[in-house]
Swiss-Prot record:
Keyword Phosphoprotein: yes
Protein name listed in UniProt: EH domain-binding protein 1
Residue stretches of biased makeup (Pro residues): 400-417
Limits of the bMERB domain: 1059-1212
Residues modified to Phosphoserine: 171, 174, 177, 222, 302, 307, 335, 436, 438, 442, 446, 646, 719, 765, 784, 1061
Localization terms from the record: Cytoplasm; Membrane; Endosome
CDD domains: CH_EHBP1 (cd21254)
Residue span, Calponin-homology (CH) domain: 453-558
GO biological process, one term: protein transport
Length: 1231
């Protein structure tokens, strides 16, 4: 298979297919004196593709007998087909080299390469048919060859063009270039590939066989054979863990005690629910324990229901061995008379047959005493042994009720720790009862390597979960299970049933099924890595390609896609955010739906875990989220549907909300090191760690509230009020100082802002990706409230939450709207105080301003108050409708401080711009680039050098918070006006004023991604809005200039001739940030490509050998991260290409308008025929341009509608699940 990364690199590129024909004319080869070639062959090759000429004899020359030639009397034509790729904004195609090789063919038929030479096919590609004569010099590969040349003519014919991912643009030969094996990896296949009925029969046979073995422990030899079968069954999915063998011994040794307790079997409260827990896909209506045990719905459940399974759930201690319970049922029904005989049988120590180092002591497993019985004090060991397997399961299952009795999973808990953690028989019983009755829709857990989730196994489990109810779909691996395309179609139909009709699919039509699935995924923005021909031509599809494609699908539907926030020179310092623009621009789930569980929560009793310490809970949580903090994104089961939802109908947004809480906890666990640097943060960090660990309910509202509030409290410890007073004093003291001192105060303000804003990056994941998790996860409604609720008593309320979580949650829910309204009132009051304070500071200054200046300031104050009132109205409206917009956090306490600073800063344009931008930067955004944002002043001093940098930084600001575009114009206008009032007429200041005017024009109607409060999508501002306003502004300026110059026709023509150059300059400035960001993205892409090539090579080697599973897992995690980053870059470049298209259309539209206005200004009777024809041509071109513009607007509108439809579908799904969750939660109760 061709490189997966190569295919990923081609996403979003244009492709053109060419046919090249080489007509060989003459070949010259000069060799040494001691050797001459037999027959020569010219081979044209690339990778595994070879095009050979016929063998020709070498004829020595007359002048130089060592230099011979091969002449083709009739040119021999060799034909190849080449696909060339290029970026949408690039001028030329990417390099693609084909190699000519001269080979010597011996009489025996063996070939040896003599010389080689390569040509770059892009140099000969042309849209028009061309023919080029080429004389190629070769590089000798053998000491026998001195030199060689080849003369041929190369013809090029353009065939077709399209997207790089189109099926007809894929090279069929490249599919086979890796020489894929015809035999699949047997490790990918599971033992049971039959239908459910056959599986049921096999399970019954296995159960009967194990029962027969247990009943007939007469001969050690027969026991050994059956024991080997049990070992195989237990070790196939569990990576040959020693614990499975150990539990198997317990099964045999503790059987006598289990037989003694048979009287309590029928009253066992865990029997049926526990089987249901182990088989979340089984029939819930089934009552028979045997049917539950022997009727799995998935192929791998033969392992999970096996008696030797070391990961099976916690059972009652009455059996001493919790793993023989189902077989005990079978034994009672099949052979009750054998029970008396079994009491006389002796347990056998098999540790020496299974493994060398037994964890049992010699006293417990004494081989010399065949009548030795296990001590009855073993429940402690049993509980801890069970806890290991159970914890590994529940780490990924995350049952809704907190499993108090579970010990921390990182180190295996010794028996001495059992009393500490409160684990006894009663707690095991109660917890098992509660957990077993809880719904368990999550996928079956994957094997665990060092407490880290296995990325490939979790991905496989997710695929099984999503496709479990679809006919004809049986997923056991990442190769053959996907070949017929039904599995891909099932996933697509599960999330987007409107895109595919699953019932109409034919399982035999491999190509059509795959084509429908790939086209459907591509239509929703998932990079296309597979083609239908891949599955048709290859009996065993490439495993890594399929895994990568499925990972992209899961990331898309679970909201784990990355998006670019900030690009740095070093890829490791670049910042990405989790979530995509289409769905995360505003709140993804409204209050009513998000808190739907609260009604069920009230019915539940408060979790009772008095014997459990916060440190124990924290250690367990820390081990759960090791991968999240190490990789920077969830690659585990946390991306699967949450525990409260039915897996087949769980909304992706609910999955997103669930997975979004994981980084919160990973941040809190990592905050112990970063928070220790600041003594002011340490106390709240500790409380955050403790509070974030209260309970194991992933989606319970009190957990979300506690974790979010604690994270925000770490920030609030910096005392926003005192910081605000400091800033007020700073601004007041500097109001009557000169400009240099004001810059010092601004640097102080920037440092204060940095102290506040840098708190979040300190607790971000150690991967240095800088995900702004708290600000980016706007899908959680409570996330937007974090920064708004900055009242001094927030810490107290947080501590109260620790004692009364349910009560606090109810209180927070009731007071949420009142708090929003109160915040709006505070903003209004602050605006009034700002205006009064500014007027007072102006009067108290060293010089009284002029009357016009005061009037201007009053107007500015009025405008500022109007903006704040508008913002307050939005806050109140949002509070009433229960929808929190993602821009609310930026107007919290700190934002109000910055508004005040901005209202007091006078006479310096940079101060206004700087505060505006800082105001809109989300918290945690200053990741290595915060200092850049405050250097616009110095950049303006060197406009020629730094104009590109300024534009690029302004663009970054707009991307960080698009609302900044709405405030920049007024800020820039105010700055320009105040600068002119101060009377600074120097050339530098004039230049600043001119550049700021251009910035005002650019951002008055910005081409940025606006936010819509009702639709979560990327909304590029429509072209008509952008174009129709801007030419109008220039038109007014043009009319004024024409009035000044008079109405003479000559002046009019001069004006129109002079204008285009200014327009071109303006256009250049406007598009500069696009060019700058494209360059930054390309640099980032090169670094990622370099690393990905190495990772893919190493990963393929590890997957083939299977020797180092830990390194393979680490490489897999890194590979998935790189794929996610690559897709983020692809999406960003697509958005920039749309901006570029709009800009090109706008430029042509403007220039046509200019020329057409000049023509229309001439009276008809004065026009010549040439002018009339020219006018008609201009009108026609303008109409065509408008049509193109409308087409672009329609495309953008279609994208917006598609996003709306997707959101509506997800909301409907969430609404359907609401009732199901309520019913399931009613069944949960703690005792």
């Amino acid at each position: 298979m061709a490189s997966v990364w190569k295919r990923l690199q081609r996403v979003g590129k244009h492709a053109s297919k060419f046919q090249f024909v080489a007509s060989y004319q003459e070949l010259m080869v000069e060799c040494t004196k001691k050797w001459q070639p037999d027959k020569l062959v010219v081979v044209w090759t690339r990778r595994s593709r070879r095009k050979s000429s016929k063998a020709h004899s070498w004829q020595p020359g007359i002048k130089n007998p060592y230099r011979g030639v091969v002449v083709w009397p009739v040119p021999e034509n060799i034909e190849i087909t080449v696909t060339l790729f290029k970026d949408p904004h690039a001028e030329e195609f990417e390099d693609k080299e084909w190699t000519f090789v001269i080979e010597n063919e011996s009489p025996s038929g063996r070939r040896k390469a003599l010389a080689t030479s390569s040509i770059n096919m892009k140099q000969y590609a042309s849209p028009m048919p061309t023919q080029t004569d080429v004389k190629l010099k070769f590089k000798p590969l053998s000491k026998k060859v001195v030199s060689a040349t080849l003369q041929f003519s190369l013809s090029c014919i353009f065939l077709r063009e399209g997207k790089a991912t189109d099926e007809d643009m894929q090279s069929l030969a490249s599919l086979m270039s890796m020489k894929q094996a015809d035999i699949g990896n047997l490790d990918d296949f599971e033992e049971d590939n039959e239908d459910d009925d056959e599986n049921r029969v096999n399970q019954e046979e296995k159960a009967a066989k194990i029962t027969e073995i247990v009943n007939q422990l007469n001969a050690l030899s027969s026991l050994d054979e059956d024991q080997d079968d049990c070992i195989k069954q237990a070790n196939v999915p569990s990576a040959k863990s020693a614990s499975s063998s150990e539990e198997l011994i317990n099964t045999l040794n503790f059987l006598d005690e289990a037989q003694k307790d048979l009287a309590t079997v029928n009253t066992n409260p865990f029997d049926e629910p526990d089987v249901t827990e182990l088989n979340p896909f089984g029939d819930p209506d089934s009552e028979e324990p045997i049917t539950e045990t022997t009727s799995p719905k998935k192929p791998e459940e033969s392992f999970y229901n096996n008696s030797c399974n070391p990961f099976k759930g916690v059972q009652t201690p009455q059996y001493l061995n919790p793993f023989d319970e189902p077989e005990t049922f079978v034994m009672i029904k099949d052979s009750p008379p054998q029970s008396t005989r079994r009491k006389n049988l002796r347990p056998v120590d098999m540790s020496k047959y299974l493994y060398a180092d037994s964890s049992k002591s010699e006293e417990e497993l004494d081989e010399s005493n065949p009548f030795y019985e296990p001590k009855p004090t073993s429940p402690n060991n049993l509980v801890n042994t069970v806890q290991e397997g159970e914890t590994e399961r529940r780490v990924k299952r995350r049952a809704p009720a907190p499993p108090a009795p579970l010990a921390p999973p990182a180190p295996p808990a010794p028996p001495a720790l059992t009393p500490k953690t409160g684990v006894n028989e009663n707690t095991v019983v109660s917890a098992g009862k509660d957990l077993s009755t809880s719904p368990k829709p999550s996928p079956i857990p994957s094997p665990v390597l060092g407490q880290k989730p296995n990325a490939s196994q979790s991905l496989l489990a997710w695929c099984r979960e999503v496709t479990k109810n679809y006919r004809g779909v049986k997923i056991t691996n990442f190769t053959t299970s996907w070949r017929n395309g039904l599995s891909f179609c099932a996933i697509l139909h599960h999330f987007r049933p409107d895109l595919i009709d699953y019932k109409s699919l034919n399982p035999q039509d491999i190509k059509e099924n795959n084509k429908k699935a790939y086209d459907g995924f591509a239509s929703i923005g998932i990079s296309r890595l597979l083609e239908p021909s891949d599955m048709v031509l290859l009996a065993i599809p490439d495993k890594l390609t399929v895994m990568t494609y499925l990972y992209q699908i899961r990331a898309h539907f679970s909201g784990q896609e990355l998006n670019v926030v900030q690009i740095e020179e070093n890829s490791s310092k670049s910042t990405y955010k989790v979530g995509n623009y289409e769905t995360d621009t505003n709140s993804s789930v409204d209050q009513e739906k998000f808190y739907a569980e609260l009604s069920d929560l009230k019915r539940e009793p408060e979790p009772h875990q008095p014997a459990r310490g916060a440190v124990d809970l924290l250690s367990q949580d820390d081990s759960v989220f090791v991968t999240d903090s190490g990789v920077g994104e969830s690659e585990s089961e946390h991306q699967t549907p949450d525990d409260h939802l039915s897996p087949s109908t769980a909304s992706p947004y609910y999955r997103r909300t669930k997975s979004d809480t994981e980084p919160q906890k990973s941040q809190q666990s990592s905050a112990r090191t970063s928070g220790s640097d600041d003594p002011g943060l340490s106390s709240s960090t500790d409380s955050a760690q403790a509070l974030a660990s209260l309970g194991k309910k992933r989606l319970k509202a009190e957990n979300l509230e506690l974790s979010d509030l604690c994270v925000s409290d770490k920030k609030k410890d910096v005392s926003p009020l005192s910081a605000y007073e400091q800033k007020l004093q700073t601004v007041h003291a500097s109001s009557d100082m000169e400009q240099g001192k004001m810059e010092k105060s601004r640097s102080l303000e920037c440092r204060l802002d940095g102290e506040l804003a840098i708190t979040k990056p300190n607790v971000s994941s150690p991967s240095k990706l800088g995900y702004n998790r708290d600000t980016d996860f706007t899908k959680k409604p409570c996330a937007s409230l974090r920064q708004i609720e900055s009242d001094p008593d927030a810490d107290k309320s947080t501590l109260n939450h620790a004692d009364h979580p349910n009560k606090a949650v109810q209180h927070r829910m009731l007071s949420r709207q009142e708090e929003l309204k109160e915040r709006a009132r505070v903003l209004l009051e602050q605006a009034r105080r700002d205006a009064a304070f500014k007027v007072g500071s102006k009067h108290g200054g060293s010089a009284a301003p002029a009357l016009c200046s005061r009037q201007l300031n009053d107007q500015q104050d009025e405008e500022r108050r109007r903006q704040l009132r508008e913002r307050a109205r939005q806050l109140i409206a949002e509070a009433r409708c229960g929808v929190k917009m993602s821009e609310l956090p930026s107007y919290g306490e700190m934002a109000a401080e910055k508004l005040k600073e901005r209202s007091k800063a006078s006479g310096d344009e940079n101060d206004n711009i700087e505060i505006d931008t800082n105001e809109e930067i989300p918290e945690g955004f200053v990741v290595g680039g915060g200092d850049e944002l405050t250097n616009i002043e110095s950049d303006l001093d060197n406009p020629e050098q730094n104009s590109k940098v300024v534009d690029l930084r302004l663009k970054k600001l707009l991307e960080a918070q698009p609302q900044v575009a709405n405030l920049l114009p007024s800020a820039a206008q105010k700055a320009v006006t105040e600068a002119s009032e101060q009377g600074e007429k120097s050339g530098v200041e004039d230049l600043r004023t001119e550049r700021l005017q251009k910035a005002t024009e650019r951002f008055r109607n910005p081409v940025v991604f606006n936010k819509d409060s009702t639709v979560r999508k990327t909304q590029l501002q429509s072209f008509s809005q952008y174009v129709e306003n801007r030419p109008e502004m220039k038109r007014q300026r043009s009319i004024q200039e024409d009035t000044k110059r008079g109405t003479e026709e000559k002046a009019e023509i001069t004006e129109t001739q002079r204008k285009p150059s200014e327009d071109e300059k303006g256009f250049k400035d406007t598009s500069q940030y696009v060019v700058g960001e494209l360059a930054a993205l390309e640099n980032e892409q090169k670094q990622i490509d370099t690393r990905a090539a190495l990772v893919e090579k190493r990963l393929r080697y590890l997957m083939d050998t299977g020797r180092n599973t830990e390194e393979e897992e680490a490489m897999m995690q890194e590979w998935f991260m790189l794929v996610n980053k690559k897709n983020a870059l692809i999406r960003r470049m697509n958005q920039l290409s749309l901006l570029e298209k709009e800009h090109d259309l706008e430029r042509r539209y403007e220039l046509l308008n200019r020329e057409l206005r000049a023509m229309l200004a001439i009276e008809d009777w004065q026009k010549t025929e040439a002018q009339k024809r020219r006018e008609q041509l201009l009108l026609d071109e303008l109409v065509a341009l408008v049509d193109k513009r409308d087409a672009l607007v329609r495309d953008l509108d279609a994208q917006e509608k598609q996003a709306e439809e997707e959101d509506e579908h997800l909301e409907r799904t969430l609404e359907q699940n609401k009732g199901k969750m309520a019913k399931k939660e009613e069944k949960c109760a703690l005792q």
